[in-house]
């Protein structure tokens, strides 16, 4: 899923310093992060029995933790804060109520092909007010994760996911598939806390530096 880094801790420290140096005086961006699934909806299950809902929740919490360490953190809200099933409509309504600058839904992939691997970034295939912004941000996120952080990527794709379709009239929205739980290497990689920390930092770095 990525080019293995010999010293992830050093990279985390380095990018936290870069984030701190790059903070500006503009109004805080409001970000809604949607940890996919939850409760009785476990989502995909990995070869090592890891569940998609748990990966998404752990990753979202790690983004929150890293963000709170910043001198000037973003305003980040989650659609769920524990193992609870929240309806898709309620997730999008929260983003609208908060007047979010960006909606990011976190998921893991699964395939009958055990060799399928890599991240995917989705935007809605429905044309709306924020279609261009969402598409641009999706390509920026893909570029960031792939070239800057070394994650294997399957590119930006378009789909009619409900959380994307229902947010596109009031904010740019993207859905990130973090890798394939059906792939032995990626399932193992995602299950390690240090690696989730690496992914979370990559996401936070993108959120902090992107032009929303």
Regions found by a protein language model. Name each.
Residues 1-10:
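Bacterial N-terminal signal peptides that target proteins for export
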Residues 9-19:
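Bacterial N-terminal signal peptides
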Residues 10, 28, 171:
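Conserved catalytic motifs of the protein kinase core domain
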Residues 24-32, 37-137:
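Catalytic-core regions of hydrolytic enzymes
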Residues 61-72, 96-100, 108, 142-151, ...:
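Sec-exported extracytoplasmic/periplasmic mature domains
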Residues 73, 118, 153, 170-172:
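A generic structural signal for alpha->beta connector loops
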Residues 105-113, 155-212:
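Active-site-adjacent mobile loop/cap segments within catalytic or ligand-binding domains
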Residues 132-157:
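Active-site-adjacent substrate-binding region
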């Amino acid at each position: 899923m990525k080019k293995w880094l010999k010293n992830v801790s050093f990279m985390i420290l380095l990018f936290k310093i870069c984030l701190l140096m790059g903070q500006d005086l503009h109004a805080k961006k409001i970000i809604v992060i949607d940890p996919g699934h939850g409760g009785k909806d476990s989502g995909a299950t990995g070869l090592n029995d890891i569940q998609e809902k748990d990966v998404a929740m752990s990753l979202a919490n790690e983004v929150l933790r890293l963000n709170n360490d910043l001198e000037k953190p973003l305003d980040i809200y989650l659609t769920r804060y524990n193992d609870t099933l929240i309806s898709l409509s309620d997730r999008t309504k929260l983003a609208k109520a908060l007047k979010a600058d960006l909606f990011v839904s976190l998921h893991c992939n699964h395939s009958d092909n055990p060799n399928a691997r890599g991240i995917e970034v989705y935007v809605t295939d429905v044309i709306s007010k924020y279609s261009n912004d969402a598409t641009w941000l999706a390509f920026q996120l893909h570029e960031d994760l792939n070239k800057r952080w070394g994650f294997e990527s399957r590119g930006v794709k378009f789909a009619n996911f409900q959380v994307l379709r229902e947010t596109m009239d009031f904010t740019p929205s993207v859905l990130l598939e973090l890798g394939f739980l059906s792939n032995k290497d990626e399932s193992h990689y995602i299950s390690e806390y240090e690696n989730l920390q690496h992914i979370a930092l990559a996401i936070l770095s993108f959120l902090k530096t992107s032009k929303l």
